[in-house]
């Protein structure tokens, strides 16, 4: 509807250009917005104020000229010029009512558009290190990233969903070594477990699999393992130095092939679990992109070489540094250590270079808020490589903090005492988790109230919205039980009987849905959909409590049923964009 109004105004402006009222080269971006006060119409535009200066006319005179040249349409019943030159547009009754037929005809497609048609967008999200199960912190990034991808797809973008698998580097070595040390315990070798190793039960489980399938094949004695190692933190040493020494010892004693086998076992078990976990959460990907593949195909060295050739690298203290300060970063960054090993940042440069070369119009990274300092260096690298860094949009997601019984739930990944995403789903359900995660702006901290998420009350937003959908389904079951039938054509022909204020509010809210989707998609804010659904559910529940639907008069009955069926469809469409189901019974 908004697009149709903009088209009418653009036609009027074109006519004024042709007759000389407006200069022929006048360019203007016609914006039509919904009014907050219905006394000022349904929509308004300030286009006359924008055109007044280039036309050298008073804004009200321009507004009057535009109104006079508006094409005849059943869409606009009347216009009104307000203030310095605002044009208020009052919709015709049939235009307001036509949304019901549109919703019925379009069904699941209602609200979708082709705004982004022809443009490719990549959304990379979650990308948690495969060093353990996903925890509740990862859950918010998963729900948010999936919803952003679905919103962009809903407005016509060609969306590619990607998970970057950090299957190389120190954290993976810590995991592999942790698995081996737990395995040694199962073979009877007594060793102090490193302070900085991974301690979760899942490490025991992987170690048990290794022992069950391979017996003592990877067993080494404590004396040769501990010989010459520096002290760990409890003994006055440095925990980072100790775990690095233990990793080196594991590689030395096991040899490349055996160490790689243990490493791969840990990686694959956890990665399979992450895939299953996300699939159960309703989150799927087009590509699982391996960090290690970048090194294997020489992409990391190529990125470094391109930076070197462009004169953006220098050597200091035996390491290779990127002059990222030349491109707005707060300090220069190491891309290759003094031991010849490339850094995680170097892999990230190669990965983002690869993304740009794949031809996406936009690249969206969804990162945890703790990575905020990482954004300038990645953009600096892209700029140094001659890429358009504005194509990269990094969305930072704040942590979700769980509360149970009013008390904050503590979590820590390496110690193993964390709440997993799977445990959260088991406690509150997938739907509540998906909805609660996206009902605030991503940059806002989220206090996740577990008790509220499980409650069956109007205070629980996802329950309140789903209950509205289920209530409509219940009305339809009652209709069938009474032997009644709904005639959609008859109902839509009698919508003019819906004169109650509740009915008018619902009609207006339903008509806004496509605009809400476009607005939410363009600024990557799924919470706008959540807020809209809460508003629509509230409108419906108020209506439900005030009126009967299965009345004796067929015309009113069919009209009201057509209205609430439209509500049901829009709620289902909106919940679907957030990865939430629309149950028929509750």
Swiss-Prot record:
One of its GO terms (biological process) is arginyl-tRNA aminoacylation. It is an enzyme of class 6 (ligase). InterPro entries: aa-tRNA-synth_I_CS (IPR001412), Arg-tRNA-ligase (IPR001278), Arg-tRNA-synth_N (IPR005148), Arg-tRNA-synth_N_sf (IPR036695), ArgRS_core (IPR035684), DALR_anticod-bd (IPR008909), Rossmann-like_a/b/a_fold (IPR014729), tRNAsynth_Ia_anticodon-bd (IPR009080). One of its GO terms (molecular function) is arginine-tRNA ligase activity. Its EC number is 6.1.1.19. Transmembrane segments: none annotated. Monomer. GO terms for cellular component: cytoplasm. It is found in: Cytoplasm. A motif ('HIGH' region) lies at residues 128-138. It comes from the Bacteria. Keywords: Aminoacyl-tRNA synthetase, ATP-binding, Cytoplasm, Ligase, Nucleotide-binding, Protein biosynthesis. This is Arginine--tRNA ligase.
């Amino acid at each position: 509807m908004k697009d149709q109004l903009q088209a009418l105004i653009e036609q009027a402006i074109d006519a004024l250009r042709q007759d000389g009222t407006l200069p022929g080269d006048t360019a203007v971006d016609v914006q039509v917005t919904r009014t907050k006060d219905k006394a000022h119409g349904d929509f308004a535009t300030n286009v006359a104020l924008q055109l007044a200066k280039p036309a050298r006319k008073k804004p009200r005179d321009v507004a009057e000229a535009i109104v006079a040249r508006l094409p005849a349409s059943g869409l606009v019943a009347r216009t009104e010029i307000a203030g310095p030159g605002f044009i208020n547009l009052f919709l015709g009754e049939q235009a307001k009512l036509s949304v019901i037929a549109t919703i019925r005809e379009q069904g699941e497609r209602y609200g979708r558009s082709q705004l982004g048609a022809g443009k490719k967008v990549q959304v990379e999200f979650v990308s948690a290190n495969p060093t353990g199960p996903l925890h509740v912190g990862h859950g918010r990034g998963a729900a948010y990233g999936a919803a952003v991808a679905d919103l962009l797809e809903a407005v016509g973008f060609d969306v590619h969903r990607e998970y970057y698998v950090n299957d190389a580097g120190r954290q993976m070595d810590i995991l592999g070594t942790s698995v081996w040390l737990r395995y040694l315990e199962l073979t009877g070798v007594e060793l102090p477990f490193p302070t900085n190793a991974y301690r979760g039960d899942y490490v025991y489980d992987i170690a048990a699999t290794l022992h069950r399938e391979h017996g003592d094949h990877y067993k080494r004695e404590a004396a040769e393992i501990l010989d010459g190692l520096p002290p760990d933190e409890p003994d006055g040493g440095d925990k980072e130095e100790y775990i690095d020494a233990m990793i080196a010892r594991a590689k030395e004693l096991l040899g490349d092939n055996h160490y790689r086998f243990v490493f791969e076992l840990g990686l694959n078990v956890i990665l399979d679990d992450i895939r299953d976990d996300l699939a159960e959460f309703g989150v799927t990907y087009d590509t699982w992109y391996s960090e290690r593949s970048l090194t294997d195909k020489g992409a990391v060295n190529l990125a470094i070489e391109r930076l070197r050739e462009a004169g953006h690298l220098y050597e200091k203290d035996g390491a290779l540094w990127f002059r990222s300060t030349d491109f707005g970063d707060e300090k220069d960054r190491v891309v290759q250590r003094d031991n010849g090993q490339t850094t995680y940042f170097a892999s990230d440069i190669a990965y983002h270079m690869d993304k740009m070369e794949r031809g996406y119009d936009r690249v969206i990274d969804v990162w945890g808020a703790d990575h905020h300092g990482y954004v300038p260096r990645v953009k600096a690298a892209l700029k140094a490589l001659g890429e358009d860094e504005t194509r990269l949009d990094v969305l930072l997601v704040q942590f979700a903090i769980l509360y149970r019984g009013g008390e904050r739930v503590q979590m820590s990944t390496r110690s193993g005492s964390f709440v997993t995403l799977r445990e959260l789903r088991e406690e509150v359900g997938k739907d509540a988790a998906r909805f609660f995660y996206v009902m605030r702006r991503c940059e806002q901290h989220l206090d996740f109230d577990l008790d509220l998420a499980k409650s069956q009350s109007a205070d629980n937003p996802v329950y309140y919205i789903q209950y509205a959908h289920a209530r409509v389904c219940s009305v339809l079951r009652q209709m069938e039980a009474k032997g009644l039938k709904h005639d959609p054509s008859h109902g839509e022909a009698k919508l003019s009987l819906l004169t109650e204020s509740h009915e008018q509010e619902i009609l207006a809210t339903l008509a806004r849905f496509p605009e809400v989707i476009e607005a939410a998609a363009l600024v990557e804010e799924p919470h706008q959909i959540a807020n809209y659904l809460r508003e629509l559910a509230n409108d419906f529940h108020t209506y439900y409590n005030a009126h009967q639907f299965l009345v004796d008069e067929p015309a009113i009955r069919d009209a009201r049923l057509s209205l609430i069926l439209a509500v049901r469809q829009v709620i289902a469409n909106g919940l679907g964009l957030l990865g939430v189901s629309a149950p028929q019974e509750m």
